[in-house]
Amino acid sequence: MADELTPETPEEEQPKKTHKQRKNGLYPGVSDELAESMRSGWADTELHGLEPIAQAAHTLARRDALSRRFPGERLVIPAGRLKTRSNDTEYPFRASTEYAYLTGDQTENGVLVLEPTGPTGHTATVYLLPRSDRENGEFWLSGQGELWVGRRHSLAEAEQLLGIPAKDVRKLAEALTEAEGPVRAVRGHDAVIESALTDKVTKERDEELRVYLSEARAVKDAFEIGELQKAVDSTVRGFEDVVKVLDKAEATSERYIEGTFFLRARVEGNDVGYGSICAAGPHACTLHWVRNDGDVRSGDLLLLDAGVETHSLYTADVTRTLPINGTYTDIQRKIYDAVYESQEAGIAAVKPGAKFRDFHDASQHVLAEKLVEWGLLDGPVERVLELGLQRRWTLHGTGHMLGMDVHDCAAARTEAYVEGTLEPGMCLTVEPGLYFQADDLTVPEEYRGIGVRIEDDILVTEDGNRNLSAGLPRASSEVEVWMARLKG
């Protein structure tokens, strides 16, 4: 990587050279002649006639709903800032979900402000870093300047794309400090903005805003459903990519699987929606195995839990448990088929008017039946479920909301989510599993080290549900046929 030397570089780190007095207002290492050269000779690259982003009409409707919920109050929703990885390198930026949901914008330092226009109604303004002109040197001297990290949109361009008036964010903190009237802000994304609002907000009022924005995302609009399907379709292709290279993964490690899927995510989307779980052999018994540094062995199972995130930040979340050599052993098939039967029961319970917990209860009932049938638990099944004894091997809940966050709507109230009722437009995962740890002495030896999870992304429809990830086979026999075809 190139190493920038900016005006902010501490004096002791500046080159030990003698420079004549400069008039250009930059730092001593820049001659007046160079400064003048860098100010001129540039074409006008302002973009005109830009089409609004695809979700612009939807983000407007979301802001209108937000305005109705908090009349007469100033609302501040930051995108967030770059986070340091180490020294002078940063993590890839990902805008806060709340900000992206309401604007469609994904640039760092952005802030959406809804200013009340009276007892009801708001005007929305998005505050952004404008393009730097060619006068102050920022565009070529700063490590975040245009010649270092790329062109950012001008404020006029941003207005065309987002359909929201845009202003310079560098003036916002001072304006917020001086502003009067009730204010709410989404916390945790921008310390500068939070500092400006310290004496104007309370945690309780801000939490109400965060909760509202979480619950507002529960029912997806048409744009969101399309993006989720796009994410799932790319994920299906990513799983196919993995099957085709399992022989190479056997020669290396789980990292080969992770890298293969990541390639698909970056080619077709923005990124992976979460850390890919590429768990081979006994690692499949670790629910969130993201180290992905283990061996991949023929005869073992591979639990692959991964999802592509689209450019608009909607993610898939799909899991398949695959026989690495293409064929399940008898005990692997027995456990897999039990999980498949459990998932079938869970998916059937997803429908409008059902309780969110219904699909979890349906799935768990099947797994409890299997564990009693296999002699691993003493019945009756209802006693097992009442005491939660099956959870030694099922461990986790059977699903969660899905959207811009892999675990979407996480701040929603209990009564609106886990104790709530399903509605058309909600999207959730159904993902039962059985996990027999390698050191579990309460099960026969042949069970030990086998972990199975099957996960699909299910959209609640007016008359039932639709499996967005139906393009990936689930039944054990269908999985084997699919793998054989892909391996050639």
Question: How would you label these PLM feature ranges?
Answer:
Residues 1-488:
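Active-site neighborhoods and metal-handling regions in enzymes and metal-associated proteins
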